[in-house]
Amino acid sequence: MNTTVATSPITVLGAGSYGTALAIAFSRNGFPTYLWGHDPVHMQRLSEERQNNAFLPNIAFPDALHIEFDLASALSQSRDLLIVVPSHVFGEVIDKIKPYLRPDHRIAWATKGLERNTGRLLQEVIEEKLGTQHPLAVLSGPTFAKELAAGLPTAIALASNNEQFALEFQARIHCSKHFRVYINQDMIGVQLGGAIKNVIAISAGMSDGMGFGANARTALITRGIAEISRLGASLGANPNTFMGMSGLGDLVLTCTDDQSRNRRFGIMLGQGFSAQTAMDNIGQVVEGFYNAKEAYLLAQRQGIEMPITEQVYQVLFCGKNAQDVAASLLGRERKGE
């Protein structure tokens, strides 16, 4: 890795659990890292306590991690930006940073989701609002924030429209013995896998909440990857992407481990709780709740059959309960795999 990359700062926008975990990972590798969040009270607490006790307690910030209170200042610190905010506010954040962007800024994001109310990929949102002059990259894969921040082994996929940006981003991560990145050329597939897996994870949680067991959960994972692959093919994604980190890897992790908010949310739905009660119980953003509607809209627009996604949408937005969904899926007409 060259000296320029080794000393290049990075600005992380979003100080929730995942944004903080990524900022810790970069700064632990020695990169000057600037972390900005929208809530000044939360940021003041991070600055004083030098850890994110709200989301990642007892994990101290490395010395290279700097807290930024002002957005303009945060953007001025680095050429490279990493956006890690919930998908339903992603467009708003792009609007906020637009006045402060320089021509040399390069923009990456680790947000997993689709644009609210449209189902558009986040790359489309950026290019509509900012044009196509900035190199872009998306980071996605099977990562829980707590494990990443703790330095446990993690692997992830990175897709970019600029080879140099991808290689330099990869070089940053590969300073660590515990954090590995695989470059992928398929930005559409990497974005899509990270978004739709949250919806499938809700269905897997619902199944477990109803006590259906491991067989049913595995069937949902398998048929879920088929849904994601069909939708991806209609949008021009590479089918192989969905067998990698940002596809099957992230899907299996999110559907099977109780660290997953989407899975826990689904479990509560399966147990008969309302969506609002489940959201309140989890206390953090459940991306799959927002993405179910957007994924359903995107599938309808593309003319792609996605029965699991549709049934989750029906539960969240049309008043169905989990038992109705199970009956609908099991009662579908016979077909080949």
Curated annotation (Swiss-Prot):
Q: Kindly give the PROSITE patterns that the UniProt entry links to this protein.
A: NAD_G3PDH
Active site as annotated: K197 (proton acceptor)
Q: Name the EC number(s).
A: 1.1.1.94
Give the location in the cell. Answer: Cytoplasm
Q: What class of enzyme is it?
A: oxidoreductase
**Entry keyword Nucleotide-binding:** yes
Give GO terms: molecular function aspect only: glycerol-3-phosphate dehydrogenase [NAD(P)+] activity; NAD binding
**Which InterPro entries has this protein been placed in?**
6-PGluconate_DH-like_C_sf, 6PGD_dom2, G3P_DH_NAD-dep, G3P_DH_NAD-dep_C, G3P_DH_NAD-dep_N, NAD(P)-bd_dom_sf
Specify which residues bind NADPH according to the UniProt entry for this protein: S17, Y18, H38, K112, A145, R261, V285, E287
What Gene3D superfamilies does the annotation carry? N-(1-d-carboxylethyl)-l-norvaline Dehydrogenase, domain 2 (1.10.1040.10), NAD(P)-binding Rossmann-like Domain (3.40.50.720)
- Which keywords annotate this record? Cytoplasm, Lipid biosynthesis, Lipid metabolism, NAD, NADP, Nucleotide-binding, Oxidoreductase, Phospholipid biosynthesis, Phospholipid metabolism
The UniProt annotation places sn-glycerol 3-phosphate binding at K112, G141, T143, K197, D250, S260, R261, N262
Task: Look up the domain of life of the source.
Answer: Bacteria
One of the GO biological process terms:
glycerophospholipid biosynthetic process
State which pathway it belongs to. Membrane lipid metabolism; glycerophospholipid metabolism
Main location per UniProt? Answer: cytoplasm
Q: Name one GO cellular component term.
A: cytosol
Q: Does the keyword NAD apply?
A: yes
**Reactions performed catalytically:** sn-glycerol 3-phosphate + NAD(+) = dihydroxyacetone phosphate + NADH + H(+); sn-glycerol 3-phosphate + NADP(+) = dihydroxyacetone phosphate + NADPH + H(+)
Q: What does this protein do?
A: Catalyzes the reduction of the glycolytic intermediate dihydroxyacetone phosphate (DHAP) to sn-glycerol 3-phosphate (G3P), the key precursor for phospholipid synthesis.
Question: What PANTHER family does the annotation carry?
Answer: GLYCEROL-3-PHOSPHATE DEHYDROGENASE, GLYCEROL-3-PHOSPHATE DEHYDROGENASE [NAD(+)] 2, CHLOROPLASTIC
UniProt similarity note: Belongs to the NAD-dependent glycerol-3-phosphate dehydrogenase family.
Q: What is this protein called?
A: Glycerol-3-phosphate dehydrogenase [NAD(P)+]
